[in-house]
Amino acid sequence: MASSKLLSLALFLVLLTHANSATETSFNFPNFHTDDKLILQGNATISSKGQLQLTGVGSNELPRVDSLGRAFYSDPIQIKDSNNVASFNTNFTFIIRAKNQSISAYGLAFALVPVNSPPQKKQEFLGIFNTNNPEPNARTVAVVFNTFKNRIDFDKNFIKPYVNENCDFHKYNGEKTDVQITYDSSNNDLRVFLHFTVSQVKCSVSATVHLEKEVDEWVSVGFSATSGLTEDTTETHDVLSWSFSSKFRNKLSNILLNNIL
């Protein structure tokens, strides 16, 4: 009997290893290089300093007017598998530098978008949406660091937020900013933690999001940013590092383990 349980346990571990390799995705960019697995769109580029520059910078090192840039991990990420939904965790560090910190626009977003989707409208739409009205076909969820309105927004399929929290980006202009975003599919909980590393000020916001209803089975994950329409409202958007991991709840493994024990 004992040997049978040991054999079953060994089989379980083999199956678990295979299942995890099939349902987990992870990557880490401590800095960025031109040969990284990234899709760059618009004005996005990798700087000589190893930073991901989303919006354009002129020869005078000042931000370009009405610039748009997007960068997504090149491999699609599976979010849904039948009735199973992945949880994910992402950490990144960015710096937004405004020419005039009191009136800059528009901000930076972390987004889950349809695979192979092109850039959308500029300005307040941040390159990820096209309208102020609901777009069911947009199939996009975004966490927006909205410098125009000094807040963190959660957007689903159009630019108007369904949840937001004040966060004074203008006041902490140019600071290195650490962000963690987590999604727990077991309770549909999306959370954002933001930390301005110099001033030690923190912002956080959370909401219930049924991700399986809002995005496609496979998505692209990454960033999009836009800069203001006039020189006084321009800003740069640089991502310094980025890591991401996602994992499905392994229902089959739980069933097998309960039967063994």
From Swiss-Prot:
Propeptide part(s) removed at maturation, as residue ranges: 255-261
Record-given protein name: Arcelin-5A
GO BP: any one term: defense response
A Pfam family annotated for this UniProt entry: Lectin_legB
Glycosylation sites: 43, 91, 100
Quaternary structure and partners: Monomer.
UniProt entry tagged with the keyword Iron: no
Entry annotated with the keyword Disulfide bond: yes
SS bond list: 167-203
Organism: Phaseolus vulgaris
UniProt signal peptide: 1-21
UniProt similarity note: Belongs to the leguminous lectin family.
GO MF terms held by the record: carbohydrate binding; nutrient reservoir activity; toxin activity
Lineage: Eukaryota, Viridiplantae, Streptophyta, Embryophyta, Tracheophyta
Keywords, in A-Z order: Disulfide bond, Glycoprotein, Lectin, Plant defense, Seed storage protein, Signal, Storage protein, Toxin
Record PTM: The C-terminal segment appears to be highly susceptible to proteolysis.
Record function comment: Seed storage. This carbohydrate-binding lectin has toxic effects on bean bruchid pests.
